[in-house]
């Protein structure tokens, strides 16, 4: 039995509201309290009074003063705000078009129902800078004896930080590891920019289901290719090092005539070797923890000795071990640094096997 516990899906642990009983996007928005609207507004600059400067306040141009500061309109500068509570969300460009929460997701209504997709969770980051809705797809793929379920994560940002995104998200069932669905991160998404034509570009739910089914087939082929690639423990140790070390650190490690022994000394946290290579204790702890998860993680014994097992050591570390929680965990796994490392790990698993 593994000493590790599963941390659940990226959107677990108090994030969002469960919406599995909802049929339409409108019901989802209402139940998750996301049924508010966003508008665009002009911005003003706050500047202190200047003894030698222009302190004239021209109210006809929208200027005003307050507590020792002058406020003037910023030309061609815009922000977004929630209309229900008048809370600012972010700064956006002139051509940015607001896409309301309901408009971003209601196209998927015809794909929800029995033998179709099911809404799972809906919620927000911050006060609404980004909102998300997840849906479980009626598509399960097999990797050897492993089952991998497939989800879609819809997100809509209101702070100008990202497009409307539809992210394909495979989850390994036994351990709830989040996996990457493609070698290129960009191939894991359908992206729609906040422009005049955004709503027209949103496809029907039936089209998204067809795209998801095709995507799941290619993902299954990708994972099964990893499953038949053999890797020894020494090769996995090297793989995890190559994933985490910088090029400079790799070069210093290569200076050892007996690299294999030097690698084992690193994994034993030998101070002299770590100092020579220039690797920090924090980074070495991450490397060792990844290898320990490879050896004893949830569902790892069944896939040890393969590139599939090596890759899942990395995804399992970020899904179940790394010190991430709540909104920070979800953001990192789906969109941020953890996702980027896991994507590099997927590519490296193939490169190391060649």
Each predicted region: which residue ranges?
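Intrinsically disordered, low-complexity regions enriched in serine/threonine
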Residues: 1-59, 123, 140-354
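An N-terminal amphipathic alpha-helical segment
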Residues: 55-75
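A short, surface-exposed helix-loop junction/capping segment
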Residues: 69-95
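Short, solvent-exposed coil/turn segments at beta-strand boundaries
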Residues: 84, 113, 158-160
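Long, C-terminal folded domains that constitute the functional core of proteins
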Residues: 91, 130-134, 257-260, 270
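Amphipathic alpha-helical segments
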Residues: 94-118
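Short, well-structured alpha-helical interface segments that form or flank functional binding sites
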Residues: 99-107, 126, 130-132, 149
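Beta-rich nucleic-acid/ligand-interaction surfaces
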Residues: 120-140
């Amino acid at each position: 039995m593994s000493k590790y516990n599963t941390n659940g899906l990226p959107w677990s642990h108090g994030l969002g509201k469960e919406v599995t009983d909802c049929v339409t996007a409108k019901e989802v928005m209402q139940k998750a309290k996301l049924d508010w609207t966003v508008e665009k507004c002009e911005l003003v600059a706050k500047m202190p009074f200047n003894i030698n400067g222009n302190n004239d306040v021209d109210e006809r141009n929208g200027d005003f003063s307050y507590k020792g500061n002058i406020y003037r309109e910023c030309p061609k500068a815009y922000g977004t705000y929630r209309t229900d509570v008048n809370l600012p969300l972010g700064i956006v460009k002139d051509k940015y078009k607001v896409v309301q929460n309901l408009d971003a997701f209601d196209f998927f209504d015809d794909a929800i129902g029995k033998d179709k997709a099911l809404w799972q969770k809906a919620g927000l980051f911050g006060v609404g800078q980004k909102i998300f809705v997840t849906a479980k797809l009626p598509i399960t793929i097999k990797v050897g004896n492993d089952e991998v379920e497939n989800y879609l994560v819809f997100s809509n940002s209101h702070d100008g930080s990202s497009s409307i995104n539809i992210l394909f998200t495979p989850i390994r069932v036994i351990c709830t590891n989040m996996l990457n669905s493609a070698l290129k991160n960009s191939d894991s998404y359908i992206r729609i920019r906040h422009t005049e034509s955004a709503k027209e570009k949103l496809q029907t739910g039936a089209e998204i289901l067809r795209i998801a089914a095709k995507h799941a087939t290619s993902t299954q082929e990708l994972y099964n290719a990893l499953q038949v690639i053999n890797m020894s423990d020494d090769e996995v140790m090297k793989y995890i090092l190559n994933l985490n070390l910088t090029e400079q650190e790799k070069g210093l490690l290569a200076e050892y005539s007996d690299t294999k022994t030097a690698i084992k000394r690193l994994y034993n946290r030998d101070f002299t070797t770590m100092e020579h290579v220039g690797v920090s204790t924090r980074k070495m702890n991450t490397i060792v923890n990844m290898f320990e998860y490879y050896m004893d993680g949830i569902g790892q014994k069944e896939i040890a000795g393969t590139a599939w097992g090596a890759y899942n050591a990395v995804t399992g570390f970020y899904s179940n071990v790394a010190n991430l929680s709540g909104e920070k965990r979800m953001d990192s796994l789906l969109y941020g640094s953890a996702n980027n490392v896991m994507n590099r790990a997927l590519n490296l698993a193939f490169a190391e096997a060649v």
